């Protein structure tokens, strides 16, 4: 329990470090590895004013993510536990893309030995739909929360077995693997929700 809690290292998108000083202060209170998610890169590229800006942003993302992979590898060797929210964001009702798992998760499956899928049913924070991108605008309310976990899953076996079910012509097997993980999360969440 307590020993494990001291060894948790969260994966945090760079938005938590850059967008708001107060959010950054909270994020810095946790041990974390910062990544540049592909979803953020896609948004940044769409906002880029020139091809040079796009190239610079891609280079920045590669640099951050390479450093993150090295840091995660060190965490693994040091016996630390990596905490990842596989969609990389909070679920927003009416925005199904916020429930889609990030393709990068496949790299983590190849890197780590085991995983446990943890679901949280219920939330004491509600997204303020007038300010959905501002975490500080979230509304706080009482809630019953139920945390549940899957059995321990061997990452490499899980990935290998699932990839074997895909046709050879599958265009994006990495995304399919994380889509399958998200399906398992949904099943686990629905099962607990019926009990809550």
Task: Name each region found by the language model.
Residues 1-57:
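Catalytic core of membrane glycerolipid acyltransferases/transacylases, capturing the structured
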Residues 49-196:
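Non-catalytic C-terminal accessory region of glycerolipid acyltransferases
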